Regions:
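Aromatic (Trp/Tyr/Phe) and Gly/Pro-enriched flexible surface segments
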Residues: 50-334
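Ser/Thr-rich, Pro/Gly/Ala-heavy low-complexity intrinsically disordered linkers and tails
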Residues: 1-58
Length: 334
């Protein structure tokens, strides 16, 4: 598994499926620490400290990671549980999928090997810009290449709030830029390649209060696209992004090894899972491409209530679909 990127902190056509799930739990831990690392005078002149873990001169505080036991077994479609959140006895979570019914599912495996087995528990979440049920079908003109009907307007130039497409600048050195745009400065360049036209937008949106004794989260993801390799380098630039809306960071936290947003044009295909790779035989991706599991890591303030939006969408048109697998959300410390 690769670790990629670091950030801070319905049924029937045309209907949306609201899979909102809320679980209330005891989030107490054995100790409490203040992990704030930002000093300086806040005037934006660059004298603010970098977050713990990014500044070698800053000692990170003690850490207590809440215990976790997977709760994704069975047949239900609890989106939070599928990625490792909201389990009994754990942290309060409010989560909901906004997607067409055919555009998301729970999955126990993909392909002919164990490459895409769960990285936590027994199942993981799939979001797709096409029918997720097509994933196990052989490729043809229609499998993994269908319009779903959009949650957003087809060809919409704006992604739903709080996502912002424009670059914010350096939010580390100038914290007053938080909230003005994408602190990762990775979304705008990719969307400009599709003239900001998005189709088949699907998302999982999570609101959660960060435990007082942690200051980061991570999760695993894999990206697959029928547009690989034929559309690589073109304007048909499907994307997967994860927007973090926190007190000290507003922006994308799902990045490639090179620090780019995850898109058809930045991923291309990985050598082990290029078209005709054995792991993809018998799937709609057998002539296309995929990534292995990757890990995204993001920093955020302890005790802050944050919103995290996992989103995937087609670029420029709604055919040649893309999918993202998401699993193993966990808390941690820098």
């Amino acid at each position: 598994m690769e670790e990629a990127g670091t950030g801070t902190a319905g049924s029937g056509e045309g209907e949306n499926t609201d899979a909102s799930t809320t679980s209330s739990t005891d989030a107490s831990t054995t100790s409490s620490t203040d992990a704030s690392t930002t000093s300086g005078d806040g005037d934006g002149d660059g004298d603010e400290d970098l977050p713990c873990g990014l500044d070698p001169d800053v000692d990170c505080p003690a850490c207590v990671v809440p215990q976790h036991a997977p709760c994704d077994e069975g047949e239900g479609l609890d989106a939070a549980a599928l990625i490792g959140l909201g389990c009994p006895g754990e942290i309060q979570v409010s989560a909901g999928v906004t997607a067409m019914e055919e555009g998301w599912e729970a999955r126990t495996h993909f392909g002919t090997t164990d490459t895409w087995d769960p990285t936590e528990g027994e199942r993981y979440l799939v979001l797709g810009t096409g029918h997720t049920s097509d994933l196990d079908l052989p490729p043809d003109m229609t499998t993994c290449s269908q319009f779903l009907g959009d949650v957003e307007e087809p060809g919409d130039l704006d992604l739903p709030a709080p996502i912002q497409e424009t670059n914010a600048g350096d939010c580390y050195l100038y914290p007053e830029l938080v909230g003005t745009g994408d602190c990762s400065n990775t979304i705008q360049g990719q969307l400009s390649q599709i003239s900001f036209n998005t189709y088949d937008y699907m998302e999982l949106r999570v609101q959660v209060t960060v435990p007082e004794t942690v200051d980061q989260f991570s999760f695993d993801w894999a990206f697959l696209s029928r547009g690989i390799p034929g559309d690589v380098g073109s304007g048909y630039n499907d994307m997967f992004l994860v927007w973090l809306e926190a007190g000290d960071w507003t922006g994308n936290v799902a990045l490639t090894d090179q620090g780019n947003a995850v898109s058809l044009n930045t991923i291309g295909f990985e050598p082990d899972y290029e078209p005709s790779a054995p792991a993809l035989v018998g799937t709609c991706m057998a002539e296309s491409g995929a990534t292995d599991w990757n890990t995204a890591v993001a920093f955020l303030p302890p005790g802050d209530t944050v919103t995290i939006v996992f989103a995937v969408f087609d670029g420029f048109d709604g055919t040649l679909d893309s999918y993202v697998f998401i699993d193993n959300f966990r808390w941690g410390c820098q």
